């Protein structure tokens, strides 16, 4: 059976946190960018509890000046 990569939620969350620090972006900054009333979704991304939607990944890639595949961390 062929094995396919899967997204590692925890490592992706750690990567989002690292990219935020590298770009000097706070949770409140992302909350404003996305227009979220509450920041819970961003904290869930950072903790690896869930992933941003594809639309939000596109925005994150733009904000971090990177690509989606550099945000997501996969297991092989």
Give the label of every model feature segment.
Residues 45-46, 56, 72-75:
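DNA major-groove recognition helix of helix-turn-helix
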Residues 1-25, 33:
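A short, Lys/Arg-rich alpha-helix, primarily the initiator
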């Amino acid at each position: 059976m062929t094995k396919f990569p899967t997204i590692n939620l925890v490592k992706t969350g750690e990567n989002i946190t690292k990219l935020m620090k590298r770009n000097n972006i706070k949770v409140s900054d992302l909350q404003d960018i996305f227009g979220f009333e509450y920041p819970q979704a961003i904290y869930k991304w950072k903790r690896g509890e869930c992933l941003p939607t594809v639309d939000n990944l596109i925005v994150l890639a733009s904000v971090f000046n990177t690509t989606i595949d550099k945000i997501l961390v996969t297991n092989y």
